[in-house]
């Protein structure tokens, strides 16, 4: 959504003098540091899409004034920075299927450094060259990226189809059950009553309590939950 500044911003804000380019970038980089916790210069720059050529001076100024602190992170080759007010984060509990444009995975180099999770959007990649699928969603579980799924919504059949799935090395066994629950939830808010899992998805290998038939079959679930069909 877009609107005119005078209809959105308070009058007091509009009456403030316009900051210089350097001052504006310094303020944005300071906000980036607050939001990201520990970050490289490239991470800080990318948060507000600041041109790479314009960040060296404001970062030096932020270091000099003590707003950000240079630090070293084990296994990171680049210099990192920590905001002076940074606090240790809380352990995250919960699950979510992430959009390719989610802030957690938007800046791919940072995602790979933090989670050892290499992720690319392959919609423009020729089908025979795709590694994981056309429109793959990362799966976040308890603060870790543990899987990725290639999904297709068959509106005519009322089915959310899991075409492919991959669990990351070291993913806990409960990741499969957590993924199924999130897929059910997604099918529900998409208005699709059924969930189908293709053989290539291989989710069933981590779900020994579910039985795979040679013909499409539904697995009994609790009332109000989607039906799951495993295809072989």
Residue ranges, per PLM feature:
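Long, low-complexity intrinsically disordered regions
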Residues: 1-97, 102-105, 110, 117, ...
């Amino acid at each position: 959504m877009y609107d005119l500044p005078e209809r959105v911003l308070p009058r007091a804000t509009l009456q403030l003098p316009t900051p210089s380019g350097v001052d504006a970038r310094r303020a944005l980089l300071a906000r980036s540091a607050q939001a990201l916790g520990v970050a490289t210069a490239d991470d800080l720059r990318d948060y507000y899409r600041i041109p790479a050529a314009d960040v060296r001076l404001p970062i030096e100024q932020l270091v000099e004034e003590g707003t950000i602190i240079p630090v070293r992170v084990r296994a990171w080759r680049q210099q990192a920075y920590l905001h002076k007010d940074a606090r240790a984060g809380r352990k995250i509990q919960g699950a979510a299927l992430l959009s390719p444009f989610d802030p957690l995975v938007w800046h791919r180099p940072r995602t790979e450094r933090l989670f050892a999770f290499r992720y690319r959007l392959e919609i423009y990649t020729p089908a025979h060259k795709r590694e994981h699928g056309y429109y793959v969603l990362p799966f976040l579980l308890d603060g870790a990226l543990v899987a990725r799924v290639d999904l297709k919504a068959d509106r005519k059949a009322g089915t959310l189809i899991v075409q492919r799935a991959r669990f990351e090395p070291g993913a806990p066994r409960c990741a499969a059950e957590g993924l199924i629950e999130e897929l059910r939830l997604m099918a529900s808010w998409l208005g699709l009553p059924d969930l189908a899992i293709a053989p290539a998805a291989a989710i069933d290998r981590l779900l020994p309590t579910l039985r795979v038939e040679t013909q499409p079959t539904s697995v009994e679930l609790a009332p109000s939950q989607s039906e799951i069909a495993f295809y072989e």
